[in-house]
Amino acid sequence: MIRVFLRQGRVLRPSTLQYRLRHFSDDKKPTQGLDFRALNNEIGGERQDKSSVENDNTPVSQAINGDIIGASSTSSETPSKPWYLRDQPEVKEEPVNIDLGLPDGAMNDIAKQLARDAIYDIKYIPEQDILIGSGKSSRHIYKAGREVMGVLKHQHDVLPTAEGLFKKNAQRMSYRRMLKKARKQNLEFPDSEWVVIDSQMGFHVHIFTAEKRELVNLEDLYKFEMDEEEVEISPEDFAWAEKGQKNVIDGDEFLSGQHNSDPFLRSDSITGLPKKPSNNPFDGGIGSGQRRSLHTSAPAATTLAVDFDGGSAAAKDDESKSHPSIIPLFMYQKWATQGDKDQVLAKYDDLQPHANRKEIVLSAITNFLKLPTTGFNDVPQAVEELFEVFSPSDASNPEWKEAFKALVNAYALNHKCVPTQALVDYLVAQQASGAAVVNWQVSEIVRATIDSTQYEQVGVTSLKEWQRVVDAKIQIIKQLIESFGLVAPVRLLANDRFIRRVARSLTQRTSASFGLDLVAKPETTKHPLDLRLKLLEESLPIKMLNRKTLFVFFAAYANSYAWNPFFKLLKRCHKETKTDNAHVQTIISLVLNSRDETAYYRLMESELGLLCDAQGELPLDKDIAVKLEKLMDNIDPEGRRFQQLRHKTNTQLYS
């Protein structure tokens, strides 16, 4: 339809076309169609009217153009270069004289004149208290910062601001994203080593990781001189600690607790504002049971410690100390009993006013070395910390004894770090300093020498090698006796325990591991026998030896399969002592566990009468009856022999 309306190379505008179509469609009926001839005539008439109007305006336009051309012809000729290539005209510079108002004198006079003018900054800057805390990790300080923000917001009705804290769950979401994409080496989740909280209450909270806190060293930056305050504290203030409740006991440690019963926690220690009762786990401790540290820093404060008698002792001023605290003495003693040496050493400076501070630290190290969790590799560091605290030049008798116990425990764990000779040299130094060396210390070294693996390993079968081990042990014992004035050790030899330990030094350590104080389960294995043990046994009367010492001699003979001295000693016991159930059970157990048929036949056929009492009766109980049954079954599996003894054992077993 567009071609119908083409007139002299022009096309009607869409608006005109729509208007014409609408105009002519309104006059005609829809069935008659569109009258294109009438439309064409109307368009031709409009074109003629337009041309006449243009002819009327032609003289005016020509006059305007003539004026423009005439004006341009009178002006200078148009340059051939464009405006951006033309040469710029030179800029004229004219000097300007301005009076600055400065005097004409020299600069020194000007400086002196300016020095008379004093400028004072009258802006008021309020004092800010700083709380410095440490966290175990970035997640730890993140959680602690969130808890502090919650306490300030919900309990004190303030809106604190923080830096270094991310949005809630930001770390968790980023960590999940890392796991999902498996790009842990390339992606890093939000991390922070320093969190700063403005409480809007006059103090700021800084929470660091341990490394960041040491690097920033914020304590020295905010350390100013201030008046020292004396605080009197009595043991009644810490009555909650004796009841087993764990709350904040000082400004240097938060401990978890059930209820906020500490009087110091009833009000804010910084602002003095009363706290609202709340179930927030951060109020008065960590309710989840996790132990967290939040250290406070106060400039050049005085550390106080409490004695049991109610008095308080002020510590010496230590400007280098950045974490003062108030801790009762019994808490240190409790940590020492638990073997928490790190806790005691971290607060060792707080113990300065106490005379027995070194003894407490040494006791903590001793108990630490006795813990089942302490291993071989923990000994060197513990020994190094011991000698950092222990000073032989000014040590008291309790300190010498406590340090000796620690070294003995260290020797039992790691004889390479603390050999036997080091223990002997320690006692020599103790005696040279004027401190008394008691017999239990000598006996302790003997016991440690016997039970240690420094000189022997289980299963030495060579007699020559075993004699070398015995010589080393005897040399240590001899050196101990001679070094401390016991040349004629009559007192010690009269002691049954010392005799038992000497016998143990001559006996190889076996899988039975029979001790010096308690009789262990007897298990014999064939080992070489040192003849000095036999000489010691024959030189002592049976009456001065108790059952434990006799067990050592019997076990030593059974371990070496030396049955002649074994039954010879049994005859001596039968003549000089009374037979009881313990003695019978010891002999039968050693023979049965030896798994030697020679010992079976000799005991059951010829030496069984040595186990009978004065009336000729064999002491029997269920344990002895069971072992006798095993011996008789090994010798006579068919049950034809030992009919009378079998009848007695069966009666005992089924009675």
UniProtKB/Swiss-Prot annotation:
InterPro entries cross-referenced by the UniProt entry: Atp25 (IPR040152), NT_sf (IPR043519)
Residue ranges, compositional bias (Basic and acidic residues): 44-53
Pfam families attached to this UniProt entry: RsfS
Composition skew (Polar residues), residue ranges: 54-64
Region ranges (Disordered): 44-83, 265-296
Cellular location(s): Mitochondrion inner membrane
Entry's Gene Ontology BP terms: mitochondrial gene expression; mRNA stabilization
SUPFAM superfamilies according to UniProt: Nucleotidyltransferase
Transit peptide feature, positions: 1-24
Keyword annotations: Membrane, Mitochondrion, Mitochondrion inner membrane, Transit peptide
Classification via Gene3D superfamilies: Beta Polymerase, domain 2
This protein's record includes keyword Membrane: yes
A single Gene Ontology CC term: mitochondrial inner membrane
The keyword Transit peptide belongs to this UniProt entry's keyword annotation: yes
Signal peptide span: none
Highest taxon listed in the record's lineage: Eukaryota
Topology versus the membrane: Peripheral membrane protein
Similarity comment: family membership: Belongs to the ATP25 family.
Function: Probable mitochondrial mRNA stabilization factor.
Protein name listed in UniProt: ATPase synthesis protein 25, mitochondrial
Natural source organism: Yarrowia lipolytica (strain CLIB 122 / E 150)
